[in-house]
From Swiss-Prot:
Pfam families: RecR_C, RecR_HhH, RecR_ZnF, Toprim_4. Residues 81-176 form the Toprim domain. Keywords: DNA damage, DNA recombination, DNA repair, Metal-binding, Zinc, Zinc-finger. A zinc finger (C4-type) spans 58-73. HAMAP family: RecR. PANTHER family: RECOMBINATION PROTEIN RECR. InterPro entries: DNA_Rcmb_RecR, Rcmb_RecR, Rcmb_RecR_Znf, TOPRIM_dom, TOPRIM_RecR. It comes from Acidobacterium capsulatum (strain ATCC 51196 / DSM 11244 / BCRC 80197 / JCM 7670 / NBRC 15755 / NCIMB 13165 / 161). PROSITE patterns: RECR (PS01300), TOPRIM (PS50880). This is Recombination protein RecR.
Length: 199
């Protein structure tokens, strides 16, 4: 095993903790940082420090933000009564890319996953329930992933929210645009057929 000087070994070990970064990638990144200018290395360290010091969760929707409420919840041009419920803050970017959604969001910060010890108490639903109970929401779009965990989470939320008499909708799933039907799996094809619409 290659031995590195303590500062290099420590940086490699910290980089390995990032998702998708193995030992070799961590070593490449560490050597890249070492070869960078001092200003670039300090800018990177400062950005990481600022990330932890300045970002927090929006008190309304749980999105990651540097202002509270976040830019979506405080926007006068957004439909505040239409709420898209997503698993993670990164899902917001996917919805925003469509440029077809003008509502606001609620971030759960996870999905139900009993095998990984994630139960309903781990999802951030308290302020979502409060918004619905106060009559501030007309429709909730459940935009969890079409995975076992995402479906379980959507079903749990539907059961939890249905008694509050709010309109609940689920994002459609089906055949991806540009794909060949021959290669679509059975579950996707079933959902596409069930979610068909009039022309």
């Amino acid at each position: 095993m290659t031995r590195f000087a303590e500062p290099m070994a420590r940086l490699i070990e910290e980089l390995r903790k990032l998702p998708g970064i193995g030992t070799r990638s961590a070593q490449r990144l560490a050597f890249h940082i070492l070869r960078s200018s001092t200003a670039d290395a300090e800018a990177l360290a400062g950005a990481v420090r600022d990330l932890k010091a300045q970002l927090r969760l929006c008190s309304v929707c749980n999105n990651i933000t540097d202002v509270d409420p976040c830019v979506f919840c405080s926007s006068p041009t957004r439909n505040q009564r239409l709420v898209c419920v997503v698993e993670e803050p990164t899902n917001i970017a996917a919805v925003e890319k469509t440029r077809g959604y003008n509502g606001v969001y609620h971030v759960l910060h996870g999905t139900l996953s009993p095998l990984h010890g994630v139960g309903p108490e781990h999802l951030r639903t308290v302020n979502l329930l409060a918004r619905v109970e106060r009559g501030e929401v007309d429709e909730l779009i459940l935009a969890t992933s079409p995975t076992v965990e995402g479906e379980a989470t959507a079903n749990y939320l539907a059961d939890l929210l249905r008694p509050l008499r709010v309109r609940l909708t689920r994002i459609a799933t089906g055949v991806p645009a540009g794909s060949d039907i021959e290669y679509v799996d059975e579950v996707t094809m079933t959902r596409a057929l069930e979610g068909r619409r009039e022309l």
